[in-house]
Amino acid sequence: MRPDGPRDPVVGPDSGPEPPYPVRLSGPVIKGFGRGSKELGIPTANIPAEELAEHPDLQVGVYYGVVALDPAKFQYHGDASRKGEDSQAAILPAVLSIGYNPFYKNKTRSIEIHIMPPLSSPSPTAEVTTQGQGHGQVKFHKLPDFYGTQLKLLILGYIRPEFDYVSLEALVEDIRVDCEVARASLQRPAYERYLAGGQGLDAVEKQRRWLVSF
């Protein structure tokens, strides 16, 4: 079960990713368990877990990083500052889980990626909206379906281990906090450069070139 107590608002060293990060993963977006959007209201892009064989020390848990989708099949139009750049893949922030999701007791390991809006956009998970009868609702960022599109992922840091939960609502709330922790962690200069570029750092630009090369 998830331990009681507040969560750290930021994770990872301020100086930037440390080994083994960044970790590269890629693959076509495939159908997952069908729960992300339907039950949880959290759209996820799943990619095949076979590539994890190249990273045997990568533990199960929740991570943050950046992603890009093949622009030949999917173009992101949610950032007005990118007008005229449709031929270039957009690099977007992401939070992801690698593991078995103890709440659902999955038998096979999966990679489930939730793509967030640009850091310049308002965060949809910053607060919980109150519905009728006092129930709270979380709105997560949603994109049109892009099954079959090639996705590239750079994992930049680790957030937390997997937990089981007493309720679906508790699981959703922890994922909401994961999104906020990921955003805050990526907003630091040493991480934001993987999204924005323009820092003149060869190591970062090399990773960015890999992300957008399809």
UniProtKB/Swiss-Prot annotation:
Recorded source organism is Aspergillus clavatus (strain ATCC 1007 / CBS 513.65 / DSM 816 / NCTC 3887 / NRRL 1 / QM 1276 / 107)
- What is this enzyme's class at the first EC digit? transferase
Q: Which PANTHER family match?
A: RIBOFLAVIN KINASE, RIBOFLAVIN KINASE/FMN ADENYLYLTRANSFERASE
Would you kindly state one Gene Ontology biological process term found in this protein's UniProt entry?
Answer: riboflavin biosynthetic process
Q: Where does Mg(2+) bind?
A: 44, 46
Its family remark reads:
Belongs to the flavokinase family.
Q: In its keyword annotation, does this UniProt entry include Kinase? A: yes
Describe how the cofactor binds: Zinc or magnesium.
Q: What is its EC number?
A: 2.7.1.26
The UniProt function text for this chain reads:
Catalyzes the phosphorylation of riboflavin (vitamin B2) to form flavin mononucleotide (FMN) coenzyme.
The gene is fmn1
Please give the residue ranges the record annotates as the region Disordered.
1-26
Kindly provide the name given to this protein in its UniProt entry.
Riboflavin kinase
Keywords (alphabetical) are: ATP-binding, Flavoprotein, FMN, Kinase, Magnesium, Metal-binding, Nucleotide-binding, Transferase, Zinc
Gene Ontology CC entries for this record? mitochondrion
UniProt pathway: Cofactor biosynthesis; FMN biosynthesis; FMN from riboflavin (ATP route): step 1/1
